[in-house]
Amino acid sequence: MKERAYPVYTVNKHAEGLLVGGHPWVYENDILHAPDTEPENGALADVVSPKGAYLGTGFVSLHSKIRVRLISRNANDTFDAAFWRRRVEYAWAYRKTVLEPADLTACRVIFGEADQFPGLTVDRFHDILVTQTLSVGMEKLKPVLFPLLAEVLRADGQNIAGIYERNDEALRAKEGLEQNKGWFDLPGETHPESTQTEICENGVFYHVDFENGQKTGFFLDQKYNRRAVARLAAGHTVLDCFTHTGSFALNAAKGGAARVTAADISADAIAMAQRNAERNGLDNMDFLCEDTFALLPRLEKEGHPYDFIILDPPAFTKARRTVENAMRGYKEINYRAMKLLPRGGYLATASCSHFATEELFIKMLKAAAKDAHRQLRQIEVKQQAPDHPILWGVPETNYLKFFLFQVI
């Protein structure tokens, strides 16, 4: 076997097949032989097949079931600042290719494994980059990588005022990392004082609280699905369940809906949705602070005249063991929406859970339609926006399902 620059992990044939197929993760139970001296947490290591063939180099995670996350499959790569600069430039060039120019000020700049930055998310909100670091390798790389992020985008003429870290995520514990949030100190720079900003997407303005909002502050993955709803909303009476800060509801209202009701169980979310409606000068909207599971049966009983319903719930499951319960939840809200809609009405329904696969989601929709004595006329099937790329061979990158139906 060729001499390696880094400690070597030998994996079994199962892992070899996954890695050759494009997956970047090595699980601890797939390791046949570990280095005699365990590398430091977050250090680099090589991965080889049972016969010693080089499979890749990645970051070691000693506290995780995912022992190695590959960053390269080229044995000749040197992992210096120039290497990471090229990676950032490549990721940004991809966004410039697949997104419309107006969408580049509110987009996902780095999408973890799909961009070969395992465990790293970087979202851009106007002049702020908001990061979430969920692997120890990326955590240790921050002093090199984060200044490069600002440099590369600025070199392209983008205005970047600062980088804010949203590492208040429980998953960091699996990497032996603490939770925290705050400004990253770019060398020689002072960060902005405010942790709030404004973005524009599809011609709709949003207030973004990237310190306290969910995830990094705003969900960018539905940008083109929101546009699909706006195109269809004109003249309709729309109910947007799980509205969060109002994104689908605002697009429907701006698209010419006769009336839009935005509903969410969170009073804070409703307050933000109202603020966004005011910012956009939309007066054809109402707001309800109510649990969708109670709201839909109540509206059906009262006979409310909605002819377009949007269901964009948070993930009902984040693990395989809870998928069955999650699918029952998805079926309940979709069944109730179909019952509430008149024949000929429209349903937009989504799931952001990777574990609720498209196959399971379609099966659930068929069952809900059967129980509701409705048929579904498919208008569009969509997925996450292309700044959240789906990497074949890495099913974890494929998570968002979005269906637009006429209910007949």
Predicted features and spans:
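Non-catalytic accessory regions of SAM-dependent methyltransferases
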Residues: M1-H126
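Non-catalytic substrate-recognition/targeting regions of SAM-dependent transferases
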Residues: I110-D123, K142-F218
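Conserved SAM-binding loop of SAM-dependent methyltransferases across substrates and taxa
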Residues: T245-A258
